[in-house]
Regions:
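Intrinsically disordered, low-complexity acidic Ser/Thr-rich regulatory segments
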Residues: 1-99, 113-114, 160-168
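Forkhead-associated
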Residues: 65-156
């Protein structure tokens, strides 16, 4: 293995460790308590398709309808504003360093699948959109239909994690 590869692997490892520290610091609630709160919230939802943010930077419920929903982040202080407008903003932890979430990262669509699925497309993001927990990167050229219980993340660390929830 050459030095450049070793350095790149070390940087990636350090970046992942920082993300894990962010997750434990920003998400101190006991996991059993969090599961109970999430279950209670899901019980109050109307019938339909939802994508639920589970990470520390994306803790919301997104209702999936017939119009596409674009996921991404705002430009950092070091970037020019982006022309594309996202519908759902993920607050990436890194304000000045490399960001895991692209400004236009992925698109969710409810009209391209059956009534119990959600179509997920990666918008050629720099860090990819990943199916979890199998860590399979979604091909930007091939939209993927997700069903109830499927999870995906924006970026490979799994910090910006989302769950597909279908309530009948």
């Amino acid at each position: 293995m050459n030095t450049d590869t070793e350095v790149a692997m070390l940087i990636q490892s350090l970046r992942f460790q920082c993300r894990l520290r962010d997750l434990s610091f920003l998400n101190p609630a006991d996991s059993d308590e969090k599961v109970a709160r999430i279950s209670a919230s899901l019980g109050r939802l109307a019938a339909g398709r939802y994508v639920i943010g589970l990470g520390p930077y994306c803790g919301e419920v997104i209702k999936i309808g017939s119009h596409p929903i674009r996921l991404g982040r705002h430009a950092s202080l070091l970037e020019e504003p982006h022309e594309e407008v996202v519908d759902y903003v993920v607050n990436d932890a890194s304000l000045l360093g490399p960001c895991e979430v692209s400004r236009l990262h992925a698109t969710l669509n409810g009209s391209d699948c059956d009534k119990e699925s959600v179509m997920l497309s990666d918008e050629t993001s720099s860090t990819g959109t990943w199916l979890q927990p199998q860590m399979q990167r979604i091909d930007p050229e091939t939209p993927t239909c997700l069903s109830h219980g499927d999870m995906f993340s924006l970026g490979g660390s799994g910090t910006n994690l989302f769950l597909v929830f279908v309530k009948k």
